[in-house]
Swiss-Prot record:
Cofactor note: Binds 1 Mg(2+) ion per subunit. May bind a second metal ion at a regulatory site, or after substrate binding.
Keyword hit for Cytoplasm: yes
PROSITE patterns the record matches: RNASE_H_1 (PS50879)
UniProt-annotated location(s): Cytoplasm
Name of the protein in question: Ribonuclease H
Organism: Coxiella burnetii (strain Dugway 5J108-111)
Cofactor: Mg(2+)
């Protein structure tokens, strides 16, 4: 485990999809001082990007009070969307540079509300590259998919 600063929440999030669209899951690993919490969930029909956004939203929603947070994701869509693209989309009336509607606007709006409560640093790591905490988040996201598929088979 990497050395972590005291009194900062470390949030590792990942989304996964089997088929795109298809059954999807999200996973979150939270670390704060000596405490650790794991969260996951799934949706029967979704996209990978929707699950990436949902993972970040659910992780931030789980924090009871405003915090300093370091969010680590393997999704450039999530990291660049929240740090670079969102203000531009809003200025353009939720349109892309091609004048098309921004995909997943309701999720982006929800994420923005959650982000506003905290002081956040966003980090990107390459997926499936041996980053231990990101691998745990990936396992949790896949657990979310497995649970959705299991419920569907019953």
């Amino acid at each position: 485990m990497a050395k972590q600063e005291q009194n900062i929440v470390y949030l590792y999030c990942d989304g996964a999809c089997r088929g795109n669209p298809g059954p999807g899951g999200w996973g979150v690993l939270l670390r704060y001082n000596q405490h650790e919490r794991q969260l996951h969930g799934g949706v029967a029909n979704t996209t990978n990007n929707q699950m990436e956004l949902t993972a970040a939203i659910e992780g931030l929603k789980s924090l009871k009070k405003p915090c300093q947070v370091v969010v680590t994701t393997d999704s450039q869509y999530l990291r660049r969307g929240i740090t670079e693209w969102l203000p531009v989309w809003k200025r353009r009336g939720w349109r892309t540079s091609n004048k098309k509607p921004v995909k997943n606007q309701p999720l982006w709006e929800t994420l923005e509300r959650e982000v506003e409560r905290h002081t956040i640093v966003w980090h990107w790591v390459k997926g499936h590259s041996g980053h231990a905490e990101n691998e745990i988040a990936d396992e949790l996201a896949n657990r979310g998919i497995d649970e959705v598929l299991k419920r569907g088979a019953q």
